[in-house]
């Protein structure tokens, strides 16, 4: 069977840049699934994406499905015919579904009986006939949150469609996709090359588009070119470009023919905090800032034009004129804000609502101030500095700079606090209070910042859970999952002596009578332990290891982490599997017993050597391990407990627990309970698989 290259290109108006990659990747994944479901043999499915097009190129696509043999078993002969030999309704319905009459059916005889059988040779459908529906289905499944309609058509897509190219080899596949009749016409760059041309063969793509249309259709190629050219441009002026991945992706999605250029701005603007300048360049203008080797911002930026100009200086000057007013605004806001102290913004926080049932930002500030001081006391941080940081924590939200450039919240608080002469750890805390903002983000760097960051997040968790608005499904408007994981990361990775129970209780107490959920403390702790589960799964821990620790519900995050590491290490020991099984057996025995057990094992009642030996070792280990448990040395404790494997195995081999003698039975059950209690001081290892 011969093979050909298939090309589909959907020519559109400008597609959403932040969604371009996901649209193209989904298009490729959907179409690959369609090919596989149809049984069409194919080679590589390559996707292309540019601002005004999505395309797929499939190598070595078979021209038809393979022929296949099908068999459909019908009713058993006993049910297929009545006593007179006439076909039953069931048989006739089955035959009708197969497109035959009952007398045309074959018979299948097996050891279990005889059935009607339809057997047919089905010729594979041509690829040409299948492709239009496969393309339409793949496009319909794209992750488009908001569709649009254009003109008088009822067709909906992410953006208006102007061309549809469907080529199998050199042949146009006739179809109407998204309201457009397929053709071999492709549109080029808006301002360079040929605005429209025809493509003779699918194999010519994407080279013909580059040569005639001045469009680099390969997304990764455009991105790599921008990165390389920007790095070279920065090197020429003695700096390093800030090529953040997200901005690089967005810029690659905005241009069809990237041309990297370098521009500059007045050095006087460098007196403004670099974060505000960078926010303006990256967020508003999609420029790449340039830093000197010492990390200081240079008065230059790199941008990407979508055209090759005969006079690039004109484009450079135009971009410099565009960015200057924005930088001047930042300079003005910075100078204006510094005319008063950060603390002077406190009264204005009373005018901004945090949440209707939970009060204003000033109310939140008061709670954070108190909670940050309480946390500081628990972890040995400077209480006065922590409460001061809490008081100032939201003041920068009322400044002109943050109002205009919202992403500078926190960092501008730090700059204004330094200007006001606040303590350095207070200023840094204002910047780091929102950390970690995302997975893998840096944690607060000093104890005061840790106290403030935890206080801010715990106040939100307690408040939102306290009014019953916990996250549901994928909806999490207050980012509670991120807040919970942030608190856990700070406590664990900074090894802070904090207990979620008392921490949550204190956060809830500070709300007074505002909260309506009577179970708020337990709800918050359960939610945070659930985030622990997700975190440790991401870290590669097995589900049963996590469940074994969660079963003990340890509420000290650092303690939880120590238990996780201990159980993970325990699983590597030779005795682990046997002791996990033994614990499961003990757990089942105790669960089935309704006896009232003793407080201690009665040594005089013990009879068998195996139970005497086990009882003695349990007593010895109980005393030996007490300081281990007190110090959180769970790994050492489990290593010691692993020594119980032989006496435990011997006990179950030689000793009957559920004997008729009640006193002896209760004594043996008590010993097993004491044995299990030792392991439960760390985790429920009976849950290990």
Curated annotation (Swiss-Prot):
Main localization (coarse): cytoplasm
Entry keyword set: Aminoacyl-tRNA synthetase, ATP-binding, Cytoplasm, Ligase, Nucleotide-binding, Protein biosynthesis
EC number per UniProt: 6.1.1.14
Catalytic activity: tRNA(Gly) + glycine + ATP = glycyl-tRNA(Gly) + AMP + diphosphate
GO terms of biological process kind: arginyl-tRNA aminoacylation; glycyl-tRNA aminoacylation
An annotated Gene Ontology molecular function: glycine-tRNA ligase activity
Pfam families membership: DALR_1 (PF05746), tRNA_synt_2f (PF02092)
Cited InterPro entries: DALR_anticod-bd, Gly-tRNA-synth_bsu, Gly-tRNA-synth_heterodimer
Gene Ontology CC: one annotated term: cytosol
Cleavable signal peptide: none
Subunit structure: Tetramer of two alpha and two beta subunits.
Protein name, UniProt field: Glycine--tRNA ligase beta subunit
The organism of origin for this protein: Escherichia coli (strain SMS-3-5 / SECEC)
């Amino acid at each position: 069977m011969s093979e050909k290259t298939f090309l589909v290109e959907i020519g559109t108006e400008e597609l959403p840049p932040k969604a371009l990659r996901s649209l193209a990747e989904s298009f490729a994944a959907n179409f690959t699934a369609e090919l596989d479901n149809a049984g069409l043999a194919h080679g590589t499915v390559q996707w292309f994406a540019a601002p005004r097009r999505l395309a797929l190129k499939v190598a070595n696509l078979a021209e038809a499905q393979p022929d296949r043999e099908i068999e459909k078993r019908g009713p058993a002969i006993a049910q297929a015919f009545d006593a007179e030999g006439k076909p039953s309704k069931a048989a006739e319905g089955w035959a009708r579904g197969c497109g035959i009459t009952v007398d045309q059916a074959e018979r299948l005889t097996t050891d279990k009986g005889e059935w009607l059988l339809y057997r047919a040779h089905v010729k594979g459908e041509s690829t040409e006939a299948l492709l239009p529906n496969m393309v339409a289905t793949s496009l319909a499944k794209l992750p488009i949150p908001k569709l649009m309609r254009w003109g008088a058509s009822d067709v909906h897509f992410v953006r208006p469609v102007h061309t549809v190219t469907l080529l199998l080899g050199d042949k146009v596949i006739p179809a109407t996709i998204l309201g457009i009749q397929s053709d071999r016409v492709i549109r080029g760059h808006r301002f360079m090359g040929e605005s429209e041309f025809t493509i003779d063969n699918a194999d010519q793509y994407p080279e013909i588009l580059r040569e005639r249309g001045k469009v680099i259709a390969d997304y990764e190629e455009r991105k790599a070119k921008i990165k390389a050219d920007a790095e070279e441009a920065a090197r020429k002026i003695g700096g390093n470009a800030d090529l953040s991945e997200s901005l690089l992706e967005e810029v690659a999605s905005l241009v069809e023919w990237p041309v990297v250029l370098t521009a500059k701005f007045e050095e006087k603007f460098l007196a403004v905090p670099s974060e505000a300048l960078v926010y303006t360049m990256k967020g508003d203008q999609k420029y790449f800032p340039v830093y000197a080797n010492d990390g200081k911002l240079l008065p230059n930026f790199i941008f990407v034009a979508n055209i090759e100009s005969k006079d690039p200086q004109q484009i450079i000057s135009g971009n410099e004129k565009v960015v200057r007013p924005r930088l001047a605004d930042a300079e003005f806001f910075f100078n204006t804000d510094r005319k008063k102290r950060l603390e002077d913004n406190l009264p204005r926080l009373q005018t901004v609502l945090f949440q209707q049932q939970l009060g204003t930002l000033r109310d939140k500030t008061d709670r954070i101030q108190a909670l940050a001081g309480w946390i500081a006391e628990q972890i040995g941080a400077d209480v006065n500095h922590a409460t001061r940081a809490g008081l100032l924590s939201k003041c920068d939200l009322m400044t002109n700079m943050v109002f205009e450039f919202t992403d500078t919240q926190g960092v501008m608080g730090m700059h204004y606090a330094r200007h006001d002469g606040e303590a350095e750890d207070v200023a840094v805390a204002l910047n780091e209070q929102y950390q970690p903002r995302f997975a893998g983000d840096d944690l607060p760097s000093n104890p005061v910042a840790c106290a403030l960051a935890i206080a801010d997040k715990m106040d939100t968790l307690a408040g939102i859970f306290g009014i019953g608005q916990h996250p549901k499904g994928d909806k999490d408007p207050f980012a509670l999952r991120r807040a919970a994981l942030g608190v856990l990361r700070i406590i664990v990775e900074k090894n802070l002596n904090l207990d979620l129970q008392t921490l949550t209780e204190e956060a809830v107490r500070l709300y007074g009578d505002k909260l309506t959920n009577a179970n708020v403390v337990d709800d918050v702790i359960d939610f945070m332990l659930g985030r622990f589960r997700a975190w440790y799964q991401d870290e590669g821990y097995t589900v049963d290891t996590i469940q074994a620790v969660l079963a003990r519900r340890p509420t000290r995050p650092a303690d939880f982490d120590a238990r996780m590491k201990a159980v993970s290490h325990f699983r590597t020991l030779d005795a682990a599997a046997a002791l996990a099984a033994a614990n499961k057996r003990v757990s089942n025995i105790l669960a089935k017993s309704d006896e009232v057990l003793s407080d201690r094992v009665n040594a005089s009642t013990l009879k068998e050597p195996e139970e005497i030996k086990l009882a003695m070792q349990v007593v010895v280990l109980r005393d030996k391990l007490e300081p281990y448990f007190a110090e959180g040395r769970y790994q050492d404790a489990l290593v010691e407990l692993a020594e119980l494997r032989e006496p435990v195995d011997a006990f179950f081999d030689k000793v009957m627990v559920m004997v008729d003698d009640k006193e002896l039975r209760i004594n043996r059950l008590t010993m097993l309970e004491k044995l299990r209690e030792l392991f439960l001081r760390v985790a429920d290892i009976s849950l290990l698989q």
